[in-house]
Amino acid sequence: MLGDRICEELDRLSREGTPFEALLAAAVERLHASNPKFHWTGIYELFPDNVLRLGPFIGAATDHVFIAVGQGVCGTAVAERRNINVPDVSKVANYLACSTSTKAELVVLIRKGERIFAQIDIDSHEYAVFDAEAVSCVERVADWLAGAYERRRTTVSAAGRA
């Protein structure tokens, strides 16, 4: 499975000591390259002020560097605590258009239990491209990244007590 192969590569990079931010960028790169119909791929990190902030991404620049929880597909995914697969973004009332070319969007939360760390956001210029296989791949990578966020949080907390 493609998601497993991407996670194996992320495991290797992690064992080699790749910094956390570079692991996020590598995950974005691998996901983006995994499907020619993924036209914009990025990670938005959730901060304590309930704002999503854009992290590493591949694709056209976007004005949506900050997104409030509840706003657009990305903010709604966090507010509703669920992944969202939108086959046709024109049907979404509160859609935030990053590009007029975007036709479909997939948002997968990076979470451990109830704690949401971030999300993977993927846009496509084609309608209804996020089939079960694509969603499964992105979910697998999101699960791996959730573990990385958890390890980072634990390491940072332990370092603060030292």
Where are the predicted features?
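Short loop/turn motifs at secondary-structure junctions and domain boundaries
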Residues: 35, 97-102
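Intrinsically disordered, low-complexity terminal regulatory regions
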Residues: 1-62, 140, 148-162
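A short, aliphatic-rich beta-strand micro-motif
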Residues: 104-111
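Regulatory sensory and allosteric helical modules in signal-transduction proteins
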Residues: 46-97
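Amphipathic alpha-helical "output/dimerization" segments
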Residues: 130-150
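Short beta-strand-to-loop transition segments that serve as allosteric relay/switch motifs
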Residues: 120-128
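Glycine-rich acetyl-CoA-binding "A-motif" of GNAT/NAT acetyltransferases
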Residues: 116
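Short hydrophobic/aromatic beta-strand element in the GNAT-like acyltransferase core
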Residues: 40, 107, 119
